[in-house]
């Protein structure tokens, strides 16, 4: 590592430190009613089917996707 590296990095990040960072104004209230068991089951099942099932299918069939050498 060169002796100049810290100086170069400080020169690159120096101008970024002076920029104003906007703050998000997010306000939320507690839910009006709690979720029931059925809503939770439907939500978790749909997430599983949407994301994990296709990924598992692709990983289990990975050999068929490989290019022949």
From Swiss-Prot:
Q: Which pathway is this protein assigned to?
A: Energy metabolism; oxidative phosphorylation
Q: Which segment is the transit peptide?
A: 1-25
Annotated compartments: Mitochondrion inner membrane
User: Does the record's keyword annotation contain Isomerase?
Assistant: no
Gene Ontology cellular-component terms for this entry are:
mitochondrial inner membrane; mitochondrion; respiratory chain complex IV
Q: What broad class describes the main subcellular location of this protein?
A: mitochondrion
Q: Where are the transmembrane segments?
A: 37-60
Instruction: Tell me the residue ranges located in the Mitochondrial intermembrane compartment per UniProt.
Output: 61-69
InterPro entries to which the protein is assigned, alphabetical: Cyt_c_oxidase_su8, Cyt_c_oxidase_su8_sf
Q: Which ranges sit in the Mitochondrial matrix compartment?
A: 26-36
Q: Tell me which domain of life the UniProt entry assigns to the organism this sequence originates from.
A: Eukaryota
Alphabetically sorted, this entry's keywords are: Membrane, Mitochondrion, Mitochondrion inner membrane, Transit peptide, Transmembrane, Transmembrane helix, Ubl conjugation
Q: How does the record describe the protein's post-translational processing?
A: In response to mitochondrial stress, the precursor protein is ubiquitinated by the SIFI complex in the cytoplasm before mitochondrial import, leading to its degradation. Within the SIFI complex, UBR4 initiates ubiquitin chain that are further elongated or branched by KCMF1.
Task: Tell me how this protein sits in the membrane.
Answer: Single-pass membrane protein
What are the BP-aspect GO terms? mitochondrial electron transport, cytochrome c to oxygen
* Subunit field text: Component of the cytochrome c oxidase (complex IV, CIV), a multisubunit enzyme composed of 14 subunits. The complex is composed of a catalytic core of 3 subunits MT-CO1, MT-CO2 and MT-CO3, encoded in the mitochondrial DNA, and 11 supernumerary subunits COX4I, COX5A, COX5B, COX6A, COX6B, COX6C, COX7A, COX7B, COX7C, COX8 and NDUFA4, which are encoded in the nuclear genome.
Q: Please state which protein family the record places this protein in.
A: Belongs to the cytochrome c oxidase VIII family.
Role noted for this protein: Component of the cytochrome c oxidase, the last enzyme in the mitochondrial electron transport chain which drives oxidative phosphorylation. The respiratory chain contains 3 multisubunit complexes succinate dehydrogenase (complex II, CII), ubiquinol-cytochrome c oxidoreductase (cytochrome b-c1 complex, complex III, CIII) and cytochrome c oxidase (complex IV, CIV), that cooperate to transfer electrons derived from NADH and succinate to molecular oxygen, creating an electrochemical gradient over the inner membrane that drives transmembrane transport and the ATP synthase.
The protein's name is Cytochrome c oxidase subunit 8A, mitochondrial
